[in-house]
């Protein structure tokens, strides 16, 4: 038994290092060199093919515009303040209850202040009334960064924060700022006037993508009360001259147009679901994405 065990251990040691043949794990130094060289060349070629394929693919992709733009979903509609569970609940006589909503609006509108839009090399005035789309050339850097249209806070009226730093919350008349999410190259197509006959209160303009808010359910519609809309030129929507958006590389300071709605007569102590929708020929809605082209928010003004 002892001899067999010693013989077995000796055979393993000899396999690991054979001093007679100068072999390590059954191979000589030259053999190990050849096999290592083979694998270095083999995997080097694989890496080269992979890198080359990636480089060729990158040559077909623009860093300024997606290749398959037609597969991008329509933009979503978003409200500010953005609160947990999209609920706004507060007491007008309790500043702490609405402080977070006010802070959210203030922070968002910081970049819309006049001081932030002073640089004439970046910003330009695009008019005080809605107008047609403002094309700024191809999506490349041949012309460098593109200019950005200024957006004045004063166009948001009672919801601008210029005259009321609480945006109506201290009076129980909360403001909600509405924006259309950025989609590179998106060109809004406003609906035809006749398609808005269902909403006679909407102020129509062929150069505005309109937005309308109403109660989500029948019982909500009775409790929403009156609403005041604010936007460029007095139109509740997004003027076309702010589109298309050219992306972060070409328009790093881009300001999307805003509008605001103020709920001036909400039924007190009642949770009201309100839905706001953008209307346009290329605005879509999805049951899977409740923010695509619309949003709904619950608002409760407590006594």
Swiss-Prot record:
The modification Phosphotyrosine is found at residue 101. The C-terminal lobe folds into an immunoglobulin-like domain and mediates cell adhesion properties. This is Sodium/potassium-transporting ATPase subunit beta-1. Residues 63-303 are extracellular. Belongs to the X(+)/potassium ATPases subunit beta family. PROSITE patterns: ATPASE_NA_K_BETA_1, ATPASE_NA_K_BETA_2. Disulfide bonds join 126-149, 159-175, 213-276. It is a single-pass type II membrane protein. PANTHER family: SODIUM/POTASSIUM-DEPENDENT ATPASE BETA SUBUNIT (PTHR11523), SODIUM_POTASSIUM-TRANSPORTING ATPASE SUBUNIT BETA-1 (PTHR11523:SF10). It is found in: Cell membrane; Apical cell membrane; Cell membrane, Sarcolemma. Glutathionylated. N-glycosylated. Residues 191-303 are annotated as: immunoglobulin-like. Residues 1-34 are cytoplasmic. The sodium/potassium-transporting ATPase is composed of a catalytic alpha subunit, an auxiliary non-catalytic beta subunit and an additional regulatory subunit. Interacts with catalytic subunit ATP12A. Interacts with regulatory subunit FXYD1. Interacts with regulatory subunit FXYD3. Interacts with NKAIN1, NKAIN2 and NKAIN4. Interacts with MLC1. Part of a complex containing MLC1, TRPV4, AQP4 and HEPACAM. Interacts with KIRREL3. Interacts with OBSCN (via protein kinase domain 1). Interacts with TRAF3 and TRAF6.
